[in-house]
C-alpha cells in the first residue's frame, strides 16, 4: 500500500494501520475498513478536516495508492456575531489564541480547547465556523466575535456607609473594557457620603489571550467623623492603597476555571484630631498568594476564593513594627432548584496564623457590610472569625427581579476588644429590575441582639442599593 504525503501521519503509523490487509485479497468491504483504519488515526489525533480516500487508479503489481486529503488552513477571517455591529477588539489579540497558520493542517481538538479556554478567561465570546476553502485542498475559518458593551457608566446610591462618616452614600463609576483594543480594562470609581470622599482606579492588561493578567490598583480616601462619640473632637483621616496583582489560570474547562494569583500591596493611613494631634499613623505592606475557583453547571454556580497573606505593619505614632500571617476565605453557592425557586449560600472566614500585632483594618469584622445584616458596619471584630448567609429566593422574571428571605450568623474568636463574640439576624428583601439599565434592591433585617457592648441596636434596619447603568 502506498500513501500520498502527509503533514500529520508518519509512514510507520499508516503502514501499521493497513498491515492486516497487506498481502491479502480484498473486496470493497475490506477497502472500506482499510480507509476507516487510517481515518481513525486522524480522529484520535484530533484532525477532522483530514480523510483517507481512494482515487480512480490502475492497480499495478498489487500496489494500491491511498490518497490522504488534508485540509490545510486557507483564509482566516474575523466577523462580528451581531449583524451590523462592529467589534473593537484587535484581531491580533484574538488570532494569537489559535494555531491557524496558513498552509498548515489545523488540529480541531486543540482549536476547540483553545476556544473553550479563551471564552472562559475573557469577557468576549468567540465561535468558529469551518468551510471548504476557496483554494482546492484548503479549509477556511471564520471566527465570530461577541463583545459586551465597550464601556459602561454607572450612578449608584446605597446605605452601606459607616454611621460615623455617613451611612448614605452616592457614587459614580466608569469602565472601559478594552482601552487599547487588547481587552485591557480601565475602571474609575468615586464614592461620597456626608463625611467621606474616596476614589479608586485600576488598569488591567492581559499578558496573553488566555487569562494571564497584570492589574494595578490605586485608591485614596478622606474621612471625617460626623456622628458618634468622637464627633466633637474634629477627627479626620486619610488613606492610600496601592497594589499590583498577577492572575494566571491554572486549569480551565467549559464548566470550571481555577486561577492562581499573587499580589503585592501597600496601604498608608493617618488619623488626626483638631488638625494638629496625630492619633494614628500606620503603614501596612502585604504579599498575598491566592486561588480562585469558578464552577458552572445549568442552574448552579460555585465561586470560592482562598488567600494566604503575609503582612508587615509599621506604626509611626508609637514607633512599633510587627509581622503577621493569616488565611482568608470566601465562598458563594447559587442553586436554582425548580421553576422559580432557588437558594444562595455565602460564607467568609479568617484565621490568624501567628506573628505580631495585627493592623486594625485586617481584623475580621461582623456587621451589615461584613456578613451579618441588621447591625452597623464593622460592629465587632477579632483576629479570627466566620460568617454565613443563607437565602431562599423566588425569581419573578428572567431579568434579575426576585424576592428572598435570609438568615445571617457570624462568630469571632481570638484577640478582640469586644465582649460580644457573635451576631445573628433574619430578614426579607427584594431585587427589582424594571428596565435593563436600572437595578435596585432593598432589605429589612431583624437583629437577634438589641445591645452590643454599649451600643443599642434598632429593632429593624432598612438597607437599599440603586444602580443605573448606561
For each of these PLM feature ranges, what is it?
Residues 174, 430-434, 439, 444, ...:
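Outer-membrane beta-barrel "beta-signal"
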Residues 176-180, 202-209, 247-253, 289-299, ...:
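Outer-membrane beta-barrel proteins
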Residues 137, 166-170, 195-199, 238-242, ...:
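Residues that define the transmembrane beta-barrel architecture of outer-membrane proteins
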Residues 151-161, 172-178, 182-194, 199-201, ...:
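Transmembrane beta-strand segments that form the barrel wall of outer-membrane beta-barrel proteins
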Residues 126, 151-153, 180-186, 209-215, ...:
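Repeated loop/turn-to-beta-strand initiation elements of outer-membrane beta-barrel proteins
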Residues 1-161, 189-198, 327, 347-349:
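Periplasmic polypeptide-binding modules associated with outer-membrane biogenesis and secretion
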Residues 219-249, 253, 267-274, 444-461:
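Outer-membrane beta-barrel translocator/channel fold
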Residues 270-402, 406-409, 413-414, 455-456:
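C-terminal outer-membrane beta-barrel translocator/porin domains of Gram-negative envelope proteins
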Amino acid at each position: 500500500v502506498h500513501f500520498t504525503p502527509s503533514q500529520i501521519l508518519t509512514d510507520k503509523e499508516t503502514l501499521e494501520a493497513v498491515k492486516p490487509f497487506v498481502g491479502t485479497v480484498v473486496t470493497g468491504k475490506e477497502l472500506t475498513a482499510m480507509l476507516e483504519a487510517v481515518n481513525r488515526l486522524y480522529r484520535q489525533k484530533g484532525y477532522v478536516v483530514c480523510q483517507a480516500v481512494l482515487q480512480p487508479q490502475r492497480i499495478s503489481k498489487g500496489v494500491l495508492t491511498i490518497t490522504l486529503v488534508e485540509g490545510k488552513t486557507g483564509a482566516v477571517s474575523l466577523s462580528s456575531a451581531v449583524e451590523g455591529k462592529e467589534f473593537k477588539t484587535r484581531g491580533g489579540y484574538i488570532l494569537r489564541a489559535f494555531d491557524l497558520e496558513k498552509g498548515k493542517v489545523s488540529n480541531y481538538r486543540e482549536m476547540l480547547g483553545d476556544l473553550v479556554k479563551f471564552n472562559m478567561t475573557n469577557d468576549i465570546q468567540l465561535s468558529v465556523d469551518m468551510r471548504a476553502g476557496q483554494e482546492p485542498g484548503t479549509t477556511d475559518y471564520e471566527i465570530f466575535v461577541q463583545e459586551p458593551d465597550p464601556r459602561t457608566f454607572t450612578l449608584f446610591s446605597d446605605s452601606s456607609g459607616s454611621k460615623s462618616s455617613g451611612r448614605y452614600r452616592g457614587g459614580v463609576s466608569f469602565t472601559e473594557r478594552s482601552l487599547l483594543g487588547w481587552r485591557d480594562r480601565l475602571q474609575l470609581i468615586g464614592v461620597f457620603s456626608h463625611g467621606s470622599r474616596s476614589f479608586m482606579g485600576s488598569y488591567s492588561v492581559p499578558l496573553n489571550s488566555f487569562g494571564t493578567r497584570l492589574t494595578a490598583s490605586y485608591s485614596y480616601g478622606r474621612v471625617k467623623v460626623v456622628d458618634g462619640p468622637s464627633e466633637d473632637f474634629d477627627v479626620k483621616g486619610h488613606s492610600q492603597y496601592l497594589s499590583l496583582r498577577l492572575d494566571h489560570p491554572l486549569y480551565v474547562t467549559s464548566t470550571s476555571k481555577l486561577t492562581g494569583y499573587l499580589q503585592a500591596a501597600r496601604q498608608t493611613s493617618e488619623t488626626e484630631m483638631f488638625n494638629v494631634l496625630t492619633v494614628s499613623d500606620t503603614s501596612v505592606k502585604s504579599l498575598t498568594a491566592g486561588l480562585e475557583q469558578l464552577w458552572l453547571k445549568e442552574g448552579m454556580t460555585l465561586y470560592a476564593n482562598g488567600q494566604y497573606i503575609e503582612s508587615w505593619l509599621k506604626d509611626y505614632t508609637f514607633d512599633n513594627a510587627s509581622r503577621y500571617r493569616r488565611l482568608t476565605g470566601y465562598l458563594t453557592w447559587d442553586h436554582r432548584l425548580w421553576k422559580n425557586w432557588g437558594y444562595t449560600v455565602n460564607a467568609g472566614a479568617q484565621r490568624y496564623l501567628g506573628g505580631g500585632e495585627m493592623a486594625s483594618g485586617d481584623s475580621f469584622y461582623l456587621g451589615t457590610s461584613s456578613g451579618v445584616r441588621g447591625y452597623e458596619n464593622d460592629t465587632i471584630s477579632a483576629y479570627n472569625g466566620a460568617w454565613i448567609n443563607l437565602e431562599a429566593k423566588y425569581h419573578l422574571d428572567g431579568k434579575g427581579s426576585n424576592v428572598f428571605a435570609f438568615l445571617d450568623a457570624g462568630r469571632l474568636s481570638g484577640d478582640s476588644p469586644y465582649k460580644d463574640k457573635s451576631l445573628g439576624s433574619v430578614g426579607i428583601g427584594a431585587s427589582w429590575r424594571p428596565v435593563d439599565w436600572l437595578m435596585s434592591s432593598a432589605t429589612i433585617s431583624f437583629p437577634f441582639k438589641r445591645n452590643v457592648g454599649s451600643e443599642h441596636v434598632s429593632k429593624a434596619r432598612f438597607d437599599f442599593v440603586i444602580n443605573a447603568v448606561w
